[in-house]
Each structure stands twice: as structure tokens, then as C-alpha cells.
A protein has these predicted regions:
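Extracytoplasmic
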Residues: 13-194
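C-terminal segment of classical bacterial N-terminal signal peptides
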Residues: 2-9
Length: 194
């Protein structure tokens, strides 16, 4: 599987050995080709209604990629208190991973991420499996930034009225399941991996 910033696209292919290789393409027009004609999540679930629900966790170490293409990638040890190595990604580029899926079935996917201060909008990514967006909603995955009041105490104006505190980003490590941010589906997405 793969994640990507808005614009460039991740493509994944299953190798002959059953491993999943993920790559990122740069042509934004590919986005429309990847999403065009994709089924909705509800239809995707019907398609895989008899699939197994493996009771296992598969961990992909982001810093153990096969290759990176582009700039802005850096492996950082102990970044912001997180043990081990983390992968800092830029806005564009490509990262290739190989993932072994020992048991075919429907899996939830989560990501441990640190939303580095930047734009005020949520982080958006896309997931592709075997080179395709599995369903429409997988093209628009959102990961929240963390906001807090700038000051611990509430300030008041000259009449004693509370003033709305200014919000600032306070990044921290978060684990987030891939889910529908439009609210149509309450449960996290399930993805079929083979």
C-alpha cells in the first residue's frame, strides 16, 4: 500500500513472490484515470463480502523502503520522541516499499504520523492497491492536524468579556485508521489485500 501527498500518485503492484511494491507517479492527470469509474465503498464491501477477516497485524516500517525518488525525504532517528527511525516526506516524490501479505483478506489500515507544522488544512493522501484506487473514497483520505489554544488562560477585553483564543498547531504523534471523513461510513475502511 502507499500514501501520497495531493498531486503525485501512488501506484502499487503485486510481484510474482506475492510482495506488494508501491511507487509514486508524478502525472496529476493520472489521478482522474485512477478514480474515474471506481466503485463506491459500499459496492466494494459487497464485492468482498465472503473474504476472510485475518486476525493479524502487519507492520510496515516506513523507514525501510526500497527506494525514494524526489527530494525532501529523510530518515530521522528518535524524531519528536518516537523510538526508532521515521521517514520525513516532502510534498512530492516517490517511495517504494515491498509488503508481504501472508493471509489474503480484508484489513483495516492505520498510519502513525506526525503532522509537521505547515498548512492549516488537513493532510490529504490516497491509497492504491495493485496500482488502482480500490474504491472512490480511498482517493480522499484525510489526516487531521492538532490544534490548541495559544495561551493556557483566557484573555478578556476591557469590558471583561472572554476573547476567543487564537489557535496554534501543536503537533504530536498520532495513529489514525483510514476512514471516511465525509461521515457516510461510521466504521474504518476495510481494504482487501492478497
Amino acid at each position: 500500500f502507499g500514501l501520497l501527498p495531493p498531486g503525485p500518485l501512488v501506484k502499487a503492484d503485486t510481484a510474482a513472490d506475492g510482495n506488494l511494491s508501491t511507487v509514486l507517479a508524478f502525472d496529476v492527470n493520472d489521478l482522474y484515470d485512477l478514480v474515474d469509474g471506481r466503485i463506491e465503498y459500499k459496492d466494494y464491501l459487497v464485492q468482498y463480502e465472503s473474504a476472510a477477516l485475518p486476525d493479524r497485524e502487519i507492520v510496515i516500517d516506513a523507514a525501510r523502503y526500497q527506494a525514494v525518488h524526489g527530494e525532501g525525504f529523510e530518515v530521522l532517528d528518535g524524531f519528536e520522541g518516537q523510538e526508532g527511525a521515521s521517514l520525513l516526506t516532502g510534498e512530492q516524490g516517490r517511495v517504494d516499499w515491498t509488503v508481504d501479505i501472508p493471509e489474503s483478506g480484508l484489513y483495516h489500515v492505520s498510519i502513525l504520523y506526525y503532522p509537521i507544522e505547515g498548512k492549516s488544512s488537513s493532510i490529504e493522501r490516497m491509497l492504491l492497491i495493485d496500482g488502482e484506487v480500490p474504491f472512490q473514497e480511498a482517493a480522499y483520505l484525510q489526516f487531521d492536524r492538532i490544534w490548541d489554544n495559544q495561551y493556557d488562560e483566557v484573555k478578556r477585553d476591557n469590558r471583561g468579556n472572554d476573547l476567543r483564543p487564537q489557535q496554534i498547531e501543536k503537533p504530536e504523534w498520532r495513529e489514525m485508521l483510514f476512514k471516511d471523513y465525509e461521515g457516510y461510513y461510521e466504521q474504518p475502511f476495510q481494504f482487501y489485500f492478497s
